[in-house]
UniProtKB/Swiss-Prot annotation:
Reaction equation(s) it catalyzes: 4-CDP-2-C-methyl-D-erythritol 2-phosphate = 2-C-methyl-D-erythritol 2,4-cyclic diphosphate + CMP
PANTHER family: 2-C-METHYL-D-ERYTHRITOL 2,4-CYCLODIPHOSPHATE SYNTHASE, CHLOROPLASTIC
Pfam families named in the record: YgbB
Domain of life: Bacteria
Protein name: 2-C-methyl-D-erythritol 2,4-cyclodiphosphate synthase
UniProt-listed GO biological process terms: isopentenyl diphosphate biosynthetic process, methylerythritol 4-phosphate pathway; terpenoid biosynthetic process
Cofactor note (record): Binds 1 divalent metal cation per subunit.
Oligomeric and partner information: Homotrimer.
EC number: 4.6.1.12
Binding site for 4-CDP-2-C-methyl-D-erythritol 2-phosphate: D8, V9, H10, H34, S35, D56, I57, G58, T132, T133, N134, E135, R142
Annotated source species: Chlorobium chlorochromatii (strain CaD3)
Gene3D superfamilies, per the entry: 2-C-methyl-D-erythritol 2,4-cyclodiphosphate synthase
Site description Transition state stabilizer, residues in chain: H34, T133
Length: 157
């Protein structure tokens, strides 16, 4: 068994769609980034890669590559799952935390959990997604961006 941690941050940007955990959330500015800027999936991808000592998402999906411009981060997460399998590992569970003041994420959490489970070949009960605010402190509190943290356990096959 091996454990990995991932953290990602993206600023909000007008004119972008907000996608978190593979779920489109209407009525709010999206996150800015080279890909779709899915902060949750990026943190999970980094945690999985770290657990297997396979680098990070910047190594595998560089933001200098046109190939990954505006790419759906669910594609990246599925690729990370394949990389793990190629190296003899399989995800066991995912525990992730979102930090943002708005929008409220609770109505979308179940779909996020299902999307992540499906992408990684897990049961939905093996995926936890939680959300909290920053109590109006810092860049999160000022609604300038969103942050995600993830811890993932993997095992050798």
């Amino acid at each position: 068994m091996r454990i990995g941690i991932g953290i990602d941050v993206h600023p909000f940007a007008a004119g972008r769609k907000l996608v978190i955990g593979g779920v489109y959330i209407p009525g709010h500015d999206g996150l800015d980034g080279h890909s779709d800027a899915d902060v949750l999936l990026h943190a999970i991808s980094d945690a999985l890669l770290g657990a297997a000592a396979l680098g990070d998402i910047g190594l595998h999906f560089p933001n200098t590559s046109a190939e990954f411009k505006d790419i759906d981060s669910m594609i990246l997460l599925k690729h990370v799952g394949k990389l793990l399998a190629e190296h003899g590992y399989a995800p066991v569970n995912v525990d992730a935390m979102l930090l943002l003041e708005a929008p409220k994420i609770a109505p979308y959490i179940q779909q996020m959990r299902q999307n992540i489970a499906d992408a990684l070949g897990l049961q939905v009960g093996d995926v936890a997604v939680k959300a909290t605010t920053n109590e109006k402190l810092g860049y999160i509190g000022r609604k300038e961006g969103a942050e995600a943290h993830a811890v993932c356990l993997i095992q050798g096959k």
